A protein has these predicted regions:
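Helix-to-loop junction immediately C-terminal to a conserved catalytic motif
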Residues: 16
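Catalytic Walker B motif of ABC-type/P-loop ATPase nucleotide-binding domains
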Residues: 134-137
Length: 207
């Protein structure tokens, strides 16, 4: 949580490996990943952005996008690995979670989907192989309230079901206090407030 320019996205970019940090270390599951290349981190760090257009290949089908995400994050090391029929059944099952009928439209180009549908798909792509860490960069901010609520509910379900460590950026104080077990407030690149579950129970948006 924090205002524009507080350093939230810079923090995420450094964790994801978009650039190397000048000092300090980045540890994930007690492993030092400070100098691990971005493409290697992407196998175990999932990320969603505010813009539903990011994170998918719009001219490719739902099936092809899920296959790319699955092969990238999985243990497949061959450049031309293929997904099996069993894998495709897995894709269909995860799409059913959305309850919007996409499991019956797997050959539809992703570019034809609405913002909410595409962000739902992006969330599934980021978690189809459960990551060690999920980064959510205001992933509901560009959606209408109804779609945002549905995406947030799906996010909570996936995170809880997979026991995934998750960091979420939001400008919405209500979301910051109601989601997760810890809330950090940032300003000028520094953490200025660290709220645990008990702290959050005693606060509201007017505090």
């Amino acid at each position: 949580q924090g205002s524009n320019g507080a350093g939230k996205s810079t923090l995420f970019n450094s964790i994801a490996g978009n650039f190397l940090v000048d000092s300090g270390r980045i540890l994930l599951d007690d492993e030092n990943i400070t100098f691990t290349p971005e493409y290697k981190r992407s196998k175990y760090i999932g990320r969603l952005f505010q813009d539903p257009l990011r994170g998918t290949a719009p001219h490719m089908t739902i099936r092809e996008n899920l296959a790319l995400a699955y092969l990238r994050a999985g243990e497949h090391t061959k450049m031309f690995s293929r997904v099996s029929k069993k894998d495709e059944e897995k894709f269909r099952d995860v799409l059913k979670q959305l309850d919007i009928g996409l499991e019956n439209c797997m050959d539809v180009p992703v570019g034809t989907l609405s913002g909410g549908q595409r962000q739902s798909l992006t969330l599934l792509m980021a978690t189809i192989v459960p990551p060690k860490l999920l980064l959510l960069d205001e992933h509901t901010a560009a959606l209408d309230p109804q779609a945002a609520e549905k995406i947030m509910a799906l996010t909570n379900q996936i995170v809880l079901d997979n026991h995934t460590t998750c960091l979420m950026i939001t400008h919405n104080m209500k979301s910051a206090l109601s989601t997760g077990n810890r809330t950090l407030m940032m300003n000028q690149g520094k953490i200025i407030q660290d709220l645990n579950e008990d702290d959050k129970k005693n606060m509201d948006v007017d505090t």
